[in-house]
UniProtKB/Swiss-Prot annotation:
SUPFAM superfamilies recorded: Ribosomal protein L22 (SSF54843)
Name the UniProt record assigns to this protein: Large ribosomal subunit protein uL22
Keyword RNA-binding: yes
Keyword set includes Cell membrane: no
Protein's job: This protein binds specifically to 23S rRNA; its binding is stimulated by other ribosomal proteins, e.g. L4, L17, and L20. It is important during the early stages of 50S assembly. It makes multiple contacts with different domains of the 23S rRNA in the assembled 50S subunit and ribosome. The globular domain of the protein is located near the polypeptide exit tunnel on the outside of the subunit, while an extended beta-hairpin is found that lines the wall of the exit tunnel in the center of the 70S ribosome.
InterPro entries in the record: Ribosomal_uL22, Ribosomal_uL22_bac/chlpt-type, Ribosomal_uL22_bac/org-type, Ribosomal_uL22_CS, Ribosomal_uL22_sf
GO BP: any one term: translation
Species this chain originates from: Bartonella quintana (strain Toulouse) (Rochalimaea quintana)
Length: 129
């Protein structure tokens, strides 16, 4: 095991929300998270609401949690928030056996993911991407 990483310190104009052990592969989750990076939170919520991906609802809940943290814990203006960072990490991989023909068995791997969303309050005009 390696040395534990020091967690990133939030600035005064930032808020964070983390969703851990989400039942989706990191690759699939990253497709949805890439849609909202750098966008204003209103545009990002609209994009997630109309996304057809299964995991978009969980990402939307995590983004709403980050917005609520910004408003309640950090006293930030929610109308001027952007998604500053959104990244995906690997979690556990649960292994299961799948019974096959002729007395054989194969392994099924069910990956899990972690999701971190950091929103930042901006004062200058930022274009919605």
């Amino acid at each position: 095991m390696g040395k534990a990483k020091v967690p990133r310190q939030l600035k005064d104009n930032e808020a964070k929300a983390v969703a851990r052990t989400i039942r989706v592969s990191p690759q699939k989750l990253n497709l949805v998270v890439a849609m909202i990076r750098g966008k204003r939170v209103g545009v990002a919520l609209a994009d997630l609401a109309f996304s057809r991906k299964r995991i978009a609802g969980t990402v939307k809940k995590t983004l709403e949690s980050a917005i609520a943290n910004a408003e309640n814990n950090h006293d930030l203006d929610i109308d001027s928030l952007i998604v500053a960072e959104a990244y995906v990490g690997k979690s556990v991989v649960v292994k299961r056996f799948h019974v096959r023909g002729r007395g054989r068995a194969s392994r099924i791997e069910r990956p899990f993911s972690h999701l971190t969303i950091i929103v930042r309050e901006v004062t200058e005009k930022v274009e919605a991407a």
